[in-house]
């Protein structure tokens, strides 16, 4: 019997469009001889819309953007099938057929542990990281504390709350200028894909960057800028994760001052070198830190570890991403392709890992014996 694969994408997030691109790529790579694929679109307003079972490849991303006027018949939790109704998340519940959810969601409400909690409540297997790893890795401040506890080197950083910024802005700026030197990068604590991130080279730009970042979150992290190579590594597995070859990001000339949202998803000016050259001892250290971060977060399925490597071979772990860009041309799938695991096989491996983790969880005891 085929595995029913529910593809969940879209979402009430600034990264809605990224999720659509990811879903389009995964759907077109699926082996429909092995999977019964069902798309579920989450609109910008948070409405869940069930699409038809897939019978072939899609031609355009827009085919995944279901609306009130072109919706298929939808199964609601309370009623018979009816035209034009949004579904309840209860549609995710398994119906006797082996079912796995593949959440192709980015950003808040997608890779921050919230939707993962829903899957846990429904006791349904799902691809990727669980509640703990997803929520911790989505929060740059919490993530940094976990890395520090594991002894993983990071660039200096200062965390700032909105309430403190409003009440003590001048004192906050003074503290940052004492701890850090320009340039610095200002980031919302709880957002991905470089959304809301700015580079500041002086006090005026710092204040402007803080104002921008606080539009997206009430907590902000300010990081020391470093002149370094940006090297990324894929991690795959559950309890015994393995690492891919390393890849390097090379933004073209002055196209982007840093690897920003547009460079990641919209431009064709960002060069990826896979595999990239790294000294053997640095490569081994990189693998060690990537696995330490994976295990420290209690991650599962997939993680992309992003490093900085300076000219004098100082290695810093910048962040990990628990749902990295996942089109065939994104860094994570390309890393595994060059390691020997093509895109379609990578998807199937992730589904297998989801089943494996779910079986292990269900084998645990949840009550004392009488």
UniProtKB/Swiss-Prot annotation:
GO molecular function, one term: metal ion binding
Keyword Cytoplasm among UniProt keywords: yes
Gene Ontology terms: biological process: cell wall organization; peptidoglycan biosynthetic process; regulation of cell shape
SUPFAM superfamilies: Glutathione synthetase ATP-binding domain-like, PreATP-grasp domain
Location of the protein in the cell: Cytoplasm
UniProt KW Ligase keyword: yes
GO cellular component, one term: cytosol
Pathway(s) where this gene product acts: Cell wall biogenesis; peptidoglycan biosynthesis
Binding positions for ATP per the UniProt entry: 177-232
Residue ranges occupied by any ATP-grasp domain in the UniProt entry: 144-352
Catalytic activity: 2 D-alanine + ATP = D-alanyl-D-alanine + ADP + phosphate + H(+)
Cofactor note: Binds 2 magnesium or manganese ions per subunit.
EC number: 6.3.2.4
Entry keywords, A to Z: ATP-binding, Cell shape, Cell wall biogenesis/degradation, Cytoplasm, Ligase, Magnesium, Manganese, Metal-binding, Nucleotide-binding, Peptidoglycan synthesis
Residues binding Mg(2+) 2, per UniProt: 319, 321
Positions annotated to bind Mg(2+) 1: 306, 319
Family statement: Belongs to the D-alanine--D-alanine ligase family.
Function: Cell wall formation.
HAMAP family: Dala_Dala_lig
Protein name, UniProt field: D-alanine--D-alanine ligase
Source species: Listeria innocua serovar 6a (strain ATCC BAA-680 / CLIP 11262)
Gene name tied to this protein: ddl
